[in-house]
Amino acid sequence: MMPEHSALALEGRKILVTRPIRQSNGLVDLIEQQGGEAIVFPVIEITAIDVKQWGEWNPQQTNWLVFVSRNAVEQFLKGNPQPFPGHVKLVAAGEGTAQALRENGLTVDLQPELSNGSEGLLQLPEWQQMTQQQVVIVR
C-alpha cells in the first residue's frame, strides 16, 4: 500500500525562520500556507551606522554607490538623509534592491538583468574597464 501524499508541501514540518522579526511575516505566511509550522527565531538585528562613524567617505568624490540588499538601502538612507550629488550613479545588486531604491524616490542607474547579486554585477561591461572611479559598497 502506497503512503498518501499531502497536497501541502510542508505539512507536518517545522521551519525555523531566522530573518529579522519585521521581515519574517511574508515567509511565515508562505510556510503556513503550505501546511508548515513556522518558528520565528530572529538571529540578527539590522541597524543603521551613524553617519559620523563612516570615516572619510565624501559623497562629492564618489562615482558609484552599490547597494547589495533592500536592508542596505533602508539603513543607508536612515543614516544619510542628505540628497546624493547628481553625478553619483546608484547600483542595485538585484530586483529587490532596485525596488527599495525606487520606493525611496531614487533612480537605479545600473542593475544586472539576468543574474542577481554581486556575481551579476561583476559581469556587467561597466565594471570591466573601470579606472579612476570611487566605488562605495553599501551592505
Feature names for model-found ranges:
Residues 2-139:
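Signature of uroporphyrinogen-III synthase
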